[in-house]
Amino acid sequence: MSSSSETRRLRVGVDVGGTNTDGVVLDPSRASEPDRGIIAWHKAPTTTNPSLGINDAITTMFQSANIEPDHVASVTIGTTHFVNAVVERDVARLSKVAVLRLCGPFSKHIPPCIDWPEDMREIILGHYALLKGGLEVDGSLISDVDEGEIREQCAIIRDKGIRSVVINGVFSPIDTAERQEERAADIIRAAIPGCDVVCSKDVANLGFLERENAAILNASILLFARKTIRSFQEPIRKLGLHCPVFITQNDGTILSGDMAAKLPIRTFSSGPTNSMRGAAFLMQNQLDEDIMVVDIGGTTTDVGLLLANGFPRQQAAYSDLAGIRMNFSCPDIKSIGLGGGSIVRDGESMTVGPDSVGYKLTQEAVVFGGKTLTATDCTSLADQGVQIGNRKLVEGALSEEGIAKFKSIVKRKLEKVIDTMKTSPEDVPVLLVGGGAVIAPDELQGASKVLKPRWSGVANAIGAATARVSAVVDTVKSTEAKMTKELLDETSQEAIEKTIAAGASKESVKVVEMDTLPLTYIENKTRFIVRAAGDFDFSRTDLSTTLIEEAGAEAEQKMDEYEKSGKSNTTRRHNELVEDIDIEAYKPSVKNRVWYISETDLEWISIGCYILGTGGGGSPYSGTIRLREALRKGAVVRVVSPADVPDDAAVGCGGGAGSPTVGIEKLAGDEMLDAQRELYKVCPTPATHMIAIEIGGYNGLQSMIIGASSEMDLPVVDGDWMGRAYPTKWQTTPVVYAERAVIWAPVAVADGGGNVLVMPRASSDRQVERIVRAALAQMGSSVAVADAPVTGAECRRWAVEHTISQSWRIGRAVARARRDNRVDGVAETILAECGGAEAGRVLWKGKVVGVERTLRMGHVYGELVVEGADVVDHDDQQQQQQPEAVTSSSSSSGDRKPKFRGLLKIPFKNENLAAIRISRSKDADGKIVEKEEEVLGLVPDLVSVIDAQNGEAIGTPEYRYGLLVIVLGITASDRWTSERGIEIGGPKGFGMDHLTYKPLGKFVKPTSVIDEFDVSV
């Protein structure tokens, strides 16, 4: 029997946590009333079979408020089951995974899970193999998949008893023609019937390692997720509810059950997201500032920043879960193993968590007659006002000293995680929600006030009930007859319509994410990805009520096999157990003017390299973990000052050339050493030292990789030929000095796939570039280049000095800003390491609202558009340094907060070329007309875009809609500011003859780490 839309108005939200199952029924039409329209709520321990808890919650609420099933418009279920399995490292719920890479000869130095915490790698990674396959960036084949090779691996996987397989192909997200991952999946399913196969392209986008990581986690949780979601849906059918059933996903929107069963990773952050959305619902009309939401459950505490607009703060370009780096957007949530069910171990060194009794709290906690001392027991013992269970049962379990120690540990854990999530040192309001909030103290350092609103214990269920609707359009369109922007607008409208069709109200839908990926191997074709979101339309009665795989007995899932295994390793190497390095006390190892690189040095240098890369040069991340592994295996990397290089030294050079987009997707093989070996077959003088071609990006580390004792074993010069990153070989300081007719010949080029190009001589450096670039287009748009050595005397005259030191100092500045929770001032901290106010300034702060890219002859061309956002700088002096055209003063007396308003355009050719403030208006025909208002920064000065959430650089391949960014301008080295230097590396070198270079400030030479820290013996 159907009901009218007026009758069917109620929304049911259920959140199945690791400890409690919470439910709420609310009437959204009464949301503004004092009771927020909450008709009924329920909290009960989570059962091993979640269907029993869901059934109990809904039945109890329906009975208490006399609710009929036909009154319900939707049921939305959220869960922390999956993320808890990962956080707890529960081997009973995490399946072993086999990883098959379709990569040909590439990525061999960076195997799967190399950057994972050691314990997670041991639990999940069961097998991996590097197989034929993969695409180049232009869609051509690295190699085709080999069915026989895949079948051989299937036999090994089958013998190991592994039932989950991940396929990760190079450039698979743009593979619309070869369908390599899909073809491999078909072969695997035929060879291993009944196994789960995850194609990486279905999980995340470009970014080989990060996509692979996400796919592996997704595969590991797949079996458990499928059975769990079926168990969620079963009680809905039994209760006679004929309404849509949704699962909440990471961004606070809803997902159909069948999609959630295939991509459970999209729900990993749904629990804390629900709590934050629920908090926003409870605090509506009271939220006029950012609030830190602390959701304390039975197993974990999840902390996130709820912005004044009611939405959670999003993570940076890369996300992190349990120490695993991924590349899909989700709320910026920090989870720690602390909850009401956390196990307390008393002793000389008391521990609280991270393991938990979870949903068995009412059976195993001492206050309920159990034998396991939990955080709830200790809280009951410490506070007589807490009425939970039988307090007498826990008396004597801890001494007064033990109680004080417990309270101190809990307080310290909460304060630390709150501190970590802050971006400024100012106190922020803290909102406590969740069933475990009872263990939290009433006061916390760093909190301006601690709030606990009514119904906060079921905020997660409220968030589920009020979850939004979203939809994605991912399509390829022809750009032959229409401009990219016009097609993007069309795709956005399609996404809006799809979101409305999925159940959103028309007036609430907005585009929340968009991306364009030119498919240059298909002429005039571009891939458009647009996501829109909106509020649920309660008047809809036409939405599907189908549940996934209603397979009778199979749907009656036995969940007993997922009882807490007890095998999670509490002595594991876990991020929260690792002591932070004392940044101020740390001193690099410099002995007799030789700097021996450590892991800490490498991390800081890597951060600095990417910032100096001005958007290009490729991400140093893969090079960082490759070199880190070499250091851990005993390799030695030596850095020396240019001043200490003998006149007759032979300073060699090597690095990558090509598109930075390729660098994050096609990981290196042996091409760098191949090129060096081929060079010295035609070059009579062997290198005695190495120097980086460019400090910016991936190439900033290449001299250290090549020079490591495990490779060529050569000292590395603290400098480079650019002081940044540039897209061409002739845009280097040796060419600026022009002391030789040709610098860059002989030269050797290798693509890692067996192809080598050697030029013993050339007519000019520009000709070297043209020939290498022409070959590059046929060699995968990314190659390794080995350059003939120069003399030590030439090196001292030409090199931009101390740029490894500069990178190290920039990285240290970012690390310090994070430690001090001054990420809001990280830009100024970076500038201080680059010479201070006279050497650079903050050009812009805001949100990315537009990205356009195209690929031509191995270069990525495009532009980034950033919409200005109001910015508060705490340093009055820094306020005075902002360009007048960018800032404006408030009319109120004494209010001098700078404002970034309007639009900033950053054109790029691999690297950012300029920062230009623009205005847009419509002409008489309604077409948008763009006007350049002011050039704020221009090559050869550095224009760097950094992530406002963590202070790290964002490269041109990572630009995407919605990112919050800071744009830095840093004055170029004086090696570039001569007339010839500006001609080569300035606007004219990029065809921007209409622009005139005006230096941002005065160049300040970087301070040498070797000079500062040397200990001579």
Predicted regions mapped to residue ranges:
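Short, surface-exposed loop and linker segments with low hydrophobicity and enrichment for Pro/Ser/Thr
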Residues: G271, Y521-E523, M690, G955-R960
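Internal, conserved structured core segments that host functional sites
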Residues: A692-S710
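ATP/nucleoside-binding phosphotransfer catalytic cores, i.e., glycine-rich phosphate-binding loops
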Residues: G836-D876, P883-V1017
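Short acidic, glycine/Ser/Thr-rich loop/turn "cap" segments at secondary-structure junctions
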Residues: N213-A215, P686-I691
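N-terminally biased helix-coil "hinge/interface" segments that flank
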Residues: S2-I611, G617-D674, G696-Q702, W721-M722, ...
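Conserved nucleotide-sugar donor-interacting segment of glycosyltransferase catalytic cores
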Residues: D713-V716
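Helix-rich "cap/lid" substructures immediately adjacent to catalytic or cofactor-binding pockets
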Residues: L673-P684
